């Protein structure tokens, strides 16, 4: 059995397969997933699992070089934003970039995989760009 927090087989496989610059998205329950992009659907019910819990576990295994958020997130200020801001202060998410929600949907077409959570707070979505550990 693995010693690290992440137990989900599909998610563990995707993170292990990421190369430098690959995109992994963590999204709320309402974010559309483009055809052809792998979906890891963790959603069980509204709020389960929440965005913050999934982000925390993903970061335990993924080296992040940068991340992309929707401008609308800054306007709505879901709880996930405060956590992301704290992680930025700890330099766990690399450089931050803001784009429109519509542009984030376009960017999702380039994702290696999208992790769907049960989060129902609007605009609780992030595109994580994989870095390297060396």
Swiss-Prot record:
Reaction equation(s) it catalyzes: beta-D-ribopyranose = beta-D-ribofuranose
Metabolic or biological pathway: Carbohydrate metabolism; D-ribose degradation; D-ribose 5-phosphate from beta-D-ribopyranose: step 1/2
Localization, UniProt: Cytoplasm
Keyword match GTP-binding: no
Keywords: Carbohydrate metabolism, Cytoplasm, Isomerase
Gene Ontology biological-process annotations: D-ribose catabolic process
GO cellular component annotations of the record: cytosol
GO molecular function list: D-ribose pyranase activity; intramolecular lyase activity; monosaccharide binding
Pfam families linked to this entry: RbsD_FucU
Residue positions binding substrate: 28, 101, 123-125
Primary location: cytoplasm
This enzyme's EC code(s): 5.4.99.62
Active site: 20 (proton donor)
Matches recorded under InterPro entries: D-ribose_pyranase, RbsD-like_sf, RbsD_FucU
Function: Catalyzes the interconversion of beta-pyran and beta-furan forms of D-ribose.
Family: Belongs to the RbsD / FucU family. RbsD subfamily.
Self-association and partners: Homodecamer.
Database matches in NCBIfam families: PRK11797.1 (NF008761)
Record's protein name: D-ribose pyranase
Record lineage: Bacteria, Pseudomonadati, Pseudomonadota, Gammaproteobacteria, Pseudomonadales
């Amino acid at each position: 059995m693995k010693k690290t927090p992440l137990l989900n087989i599909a998610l563990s496989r995707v993170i292990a397969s990421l190369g430098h610059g690959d995109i992994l998205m963590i999204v709320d329950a309402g974010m559309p997933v483009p055809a052809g992009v792998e979906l890891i659907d963790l959603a069980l019910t509204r709020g389960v699992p929440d965005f913050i819990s999934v982000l925390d576990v993903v970061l335990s295994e993924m080296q992040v070089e940068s991340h992309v958020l929707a401008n609308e997130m800054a306007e709505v200020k879901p709880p996930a934003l405060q956590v992301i801001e704290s992680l930025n202060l700890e330099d766990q998410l690399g450089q931050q970039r803001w784009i429109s929600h519509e542009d984030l949907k376009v960017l999702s077409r380039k994702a290696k995989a999208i992790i769907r959570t049960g989060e129902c707070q609007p605009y609780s979505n992030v595109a994580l760009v994989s870095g390297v550990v060396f």
